[in-house]
Amino acid sequence: MTQVFQGRSFLAEKDFTRAELEYLIDFSAHLKDLKKRGVPHHYLEGKNIALLFEKTSTRTRSAFTTAAIDLGAHPEYLGANDIQLGKKESTEDTAKVLGRMFDGIEFRGFSQRKVEELAEFSGVPVWNGLTDEWHPTQMLADFLTVKENFGKLEGLTLVYCGDGRNNMANSLLVTGAILGVNVRIFSPKELFPADDIVKLAESYAKESGAKLLITEDADEAVRGADVLYTDVWVSMGEESKFEERVKLLKPYQVNMELIKKAGNENLIFLHCLPAFHDTNTVYGKDIEEKFGVKEMEVTDEVFRSSYARQFDQAENRMHTIKAVMAATLGNLFIPKV
């Protein structure tokens, strides 16, 4: 079957097939090479891109902005105070207006339904920059980083440590299953992934041959791992749960002891950032004062170690987002994948 990207939205990882995701990862590597060599790639010349942000961001905003400019497009940032999604104006009406003015729309916010409505009613490609359920553009950056380090994806083992119910755990479990990557969720039972997410991932794993594991046993989780991945213990909007999460997730911290348990000297560490690995922020100092914790989901030792690839990963947000925008909006000759 012929598969084309033009005009399509990217709202969740399951929107694209395995072959399409692999194509986008390889296309990202190509665009990264062009960028490094200073070769222009203005595939979106004259296009206007709306960047809608209900949730604040450093990497997603910077990546979409620089990617759009590199592609020759004009990005327009609309923050939480600039848009009325569901407040004074329905998401449907907002989508219809923005679709008349912009060629593509990025949305970063809380509700998956909102990004779906934007895609349904705008008439232009919509890209999910993060919702409470999924983080698809992050996945392309993550698996590009993994492929850069190992030269392949299929058969590798990635372990996610921490809150197994958040959007990162959802996305890693499903995307890994699609791509044939073995995914293990190392989490307390109280925070195991939702059953519907697990069932979805298992359905993809049957096709790809990926092996999935959800466990609270450290030895079982990390043995032979190629990638250890973690994220913040408290997601945006859940700040009231801080004390509970610190107590619950302390045993799931990524530290050198956990890395050594993996028994793989070529292991890499990933984090989607921001990371609470020290107290060099106002937030970090506040956490230390309230809970007596100087390091949270990852120790400073690991974060600054030779295993760490989180800044390569952050850079790759730009290259992978560029690939998605170019493929879905650039009228490129991609007849099938």
UniProtKB/Swiss-Prot annotation:
Transmembrane segments: none
Domain of life: Bacteria
Purpose of the protein: Reversibly catalyzes the transfer of the carbamoyl group from carbamoyl phosphate (CP) to the N(epsilon) atom of ornithine (ORN) to produce L-citrulline.
Keyword vocabulary terms for this entry: Arginine metabolism, Cytoplasm, Transferase
Positions annotated to bind carbamoyl phosphate: 57-60, 84, 108, 135-138, 272-273, 317
EC supergroup of this enzyme: transferase
Pathway listed: Amino-acid degradation; L-arginine degradation via ADI pathway; carbamoyl phosphate from L-arginine: step 2/2
GO terms under cellular component: cytoplasm
Primary site of residence: cytoplasm
GO MF: amino acid binding; ornithine carbamoyltransferase activity
Reaction it catalyzes: carbamoyl phosphate + L-ornithine = L-citrulline + phosphate + H(+)
Family, similarity comment: Belongs to the aspartate/ornithine carbamoyltransferase superfamily. OTCase family.
Organism: Streptococcus ratti
Binding site for L-ornithine: 167, 231, 235-236
Signal peptide per UniProt: none
EC numbers for this chain: 2.1.3.3
Protein's name according to its UniProt entry: Ornithine carbamoyltransferase, catabolic
One GO-annotated biological process of the protein: citrulline biosynthetic process
Location of the protein in the cell: Cytoplasm
InterPro entries: Asp/Orn_carbamoyltranf_P-bd, Asp/Orn_carbamoylTrfase, Asp/Orn_carbamoylTrfase_sf, Asp_carbamoyltransf_Asp/Orn-bd, Orn/put_carbamltrans, OTCase_ArgI
